[in-house]
């Protein structure tokens, strides 16, 4: 096998007839246990069949975040090392495979700079945005570099992605070329908009709640050999109540929410089945390497839940995520998307290749692997060379290693440490050990062969290992990722609560318009004075009367969603601000529950980034009642402190204040 791969590398053109096709598929916000072959009750027979005839990875890692996982997947490098969304320090998969004779195409979510056709994809259909309406799309849809008008009726993104994939693959087949096709489904990312039949298929199945579903998933994971029979699962965290503690109305709405998730995942499987059937019919399936992965674990951020007066299968309905169900979907692990604990970074990975796989079909691979390994693996199997230089870019060295030895029936050699970083969540996987920090909190150390659920922090017992791994993390951060600022600073020494203001607040929150069956009274989705959600590039902490924002990028801010405001405007937002950041400041708002900011109304305002305190009064000339706010106090990296933040009515009455 190694000799063949060596010959491929010497002269790829001579072996064109033997080169495999590549079908790379990425789901969005899929939890570790969301597929049947990973423990789920959701019906995914086609993906389960791929797993039965191929490999499942039990320790396949991502970056815990949408865009950075896509960078690592396509580039074979850590996201910061590759230049993040710009890809300025990388050469990506289609640019590697096309010179080896491959027809390259993509369908689905891009979420990076420019367009796929600017980075070697010869064909592209999909949306450039990070999320889209499943039925109506958005203005970023493109077809081969040109704007694509989404049809007003009969359109659904998951289906459209496979429709165009089949067209592009047929085009490659007609040209008698091996092909590389990348499908990036936006499912099951919010807004949760399943097709009607897919939603109704699961209605009522989740009335038993997240405690029972998680227990059943963990039991199945052990039964199918994904987890050792004696492995422990993480307990339900304090920030999630027992299912029985929810009101009857909450239980009803949360059950419907999970039915929407299940419908989205079921549809991915149905469309994968349609695609696989066409490959088999054309005689392509045996020599096609299919790799199915996810960009991060299940999402915990509550952005509007199910409501009793709406159904999710309409373009005008936008249900959001649930922390309780994210916990269940990431079984048996802790935490979620954006965190570097296993719940955020360990997700399903299925590899299927009948013509080349030498492992026993149905095997579970326990060797740690990462999205950065995909490019070197595909390049080796294709006999393609990875360029060390490229016009107008400065490619950095690859971070990943080839998984070809595993495919060939062998074992992985010792790999370099897996570097983990998103914002101030960080970690390092090095052999049997994992070092991890929650939002710059103290380093925690876990022995992964005996503690995958990260229940027993042994940092105090092994200070030498912590010191060695922490030094390695900082060395990689500075010298490989060239990361500076707060993300690269030493971690704290005092422990803090592991909480995020964007997670569901079940103690004071029920989904919009939910009526408790106990008393029939309407309750708001969110108390107006609940903590705002930290947006992208933002870490939020509270110190006494102050909201402290740590901006790590160019689009920071705070989101105030589903406000329980009944008094009509105009409104005034008052606060004191001290900024050590830079860039423009903006305020967005909407009175429409269906409008997702930054769509809506907008106000630019001036901030002096001089480290001094300044009084701010922002007027919103709005006669209707306010539904949501977004406050962006800066546009660059640095710290911003806000205190005395309050929303006032026309008569000066305080309608809400934060914290």
Q: For each of these PLM feature ranges, what is it?
A:
Residues 637-656:
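Exposed low-complexity, polar/acidic, P/S/T/G-rich flexible segments that act as propeptides
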Residues 16-439, 443, 448-471, 485, ...:
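Formylglycine-dependent sulfatase
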């Amino acid at each position: 096998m190694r000799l063949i791969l060596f010959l491929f590398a010497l002269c790829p053109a001579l072996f064109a007839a033997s080169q495999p096709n590549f079908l790379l598929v990425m789901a969005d916000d899929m939890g570790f246990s969301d597929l049947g072959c990973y423990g789920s009750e959701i019906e995914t027979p086609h993906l389960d069949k791929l797993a039965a005839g191929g490999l499942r990875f039990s320790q396949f890692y991502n970056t815990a975040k949408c865009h950075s996982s896509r960078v690592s997947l396509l580039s074979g490098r850590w996201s910061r090392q590759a230049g993040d969304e710009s890809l300025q320090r990388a050469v990506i998969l289609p640019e590697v495979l096309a010179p080896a004779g491959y027809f390259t195409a993509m369908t689905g979510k891009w979420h990076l700079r420019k367009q796929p056709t600017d980075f070697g994809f010869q064909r592209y259909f999909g949306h450039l945005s990070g999320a889209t309406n499943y039925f109506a799309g958005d203005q970023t849809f493109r077809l081969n570099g040109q704007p694509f008008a989404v049809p007003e009726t009969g359109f659904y993104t998951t289906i459209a992605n496979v429709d165009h994939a089949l067209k592009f693959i047929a085009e490659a087949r007609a040209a008698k070329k091996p092909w590389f096709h990348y499908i990036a489904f936006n499912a099951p990312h919010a807004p949760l908009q399943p097709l009607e039949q897919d939603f109704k298929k699961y209605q009522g199945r989740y009335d038993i709640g997240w405690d029972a579903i998680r227990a059943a998933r963990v039991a199945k994971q052990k039964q199918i050999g994904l987890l050792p029979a004696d492995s422990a699962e993480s307990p339900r965290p304090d920030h999630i109540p027992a299912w029985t503690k929810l009101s009857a109305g909450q239980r009803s709405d949360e059950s419907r929410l999970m039915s929407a998730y299940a419908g989205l995942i079921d549809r991915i499987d149905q469309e994968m089945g349609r695609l696989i059937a066409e490959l088999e019919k054309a005689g392509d399936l045996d020599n096609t390497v299919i790799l199915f992965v996810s960009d991060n674990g299940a999402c915990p951020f509550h952005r509007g839940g199910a409501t009793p007066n709406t159904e999710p299968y309409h373009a005008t309905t936008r249900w959001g995520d649930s922390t309780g169900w994210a916990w269940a979907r990431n079984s048996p692990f802790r935490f979620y998307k954006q965190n570097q604990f296993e719940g955020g970074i360990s997700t399903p990975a299925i590899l299927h290749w009948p013509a080349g796989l030498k492992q026993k079909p149905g095997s579970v691979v326990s060797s740690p692997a990462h999205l950065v390994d995909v490019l070197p693996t595909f390049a080796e199997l294709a006999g393609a060379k990875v360029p060390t230089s490229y016009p107008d870019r400065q490619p950095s060295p690859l971070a990943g290693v080839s998984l070809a030895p595993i495919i060939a029936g062998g074992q992985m050699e010792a790999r370099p440490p897996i570097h983990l970083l998103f914002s101030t969540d960080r970690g390092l996987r090095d052999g049997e050990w994992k070092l991890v920090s929650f939002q710059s909190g103290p380093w925690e150390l876990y022995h992964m062969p005996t503690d995958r659920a990260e229940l027993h922090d042994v940092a105090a017992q092994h200070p030498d290992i912590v010191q060695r791994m922490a030094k390695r993390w900082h060395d990689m951060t500075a010298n490989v990722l060239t990361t500076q600022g707060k993300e690269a600073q030493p971690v704290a020494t005092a422990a803090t609560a592991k909480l995020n203001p964007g997670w569901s607040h079940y103690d004071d929150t029920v989904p919009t318009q939910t009526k408790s069956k106990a008393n029939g009274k309407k309750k708001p989705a969110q108390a107006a004075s609940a903590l705002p959600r930290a947006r992208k590039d933002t870490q939020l902490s509270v110190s006494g009367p102050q909201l402290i924002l740590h901006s790590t990028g160019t689009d920071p801010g705070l989101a105030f969603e589903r406000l329980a405001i009944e008094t009509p405007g105009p409104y005034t937002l008052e606060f004191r601000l001290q900024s050590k950041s830079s860039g423009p400041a903006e305020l967005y708002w909407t009175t429409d529950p269906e409008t997702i900011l930054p769509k809506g109304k907008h106000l630019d305002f001036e901030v002096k980034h001089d480290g001094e305190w300044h009084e701010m009064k922002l007027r919103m000339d709005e006669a209707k009642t306010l539904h949501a706010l977004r406050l962006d106090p800066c546009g660059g990296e640095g710290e911003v402190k806000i205190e005395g933040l309050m929303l006032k009515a026309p008569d000066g009455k305080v309608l809400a204040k934060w914290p």
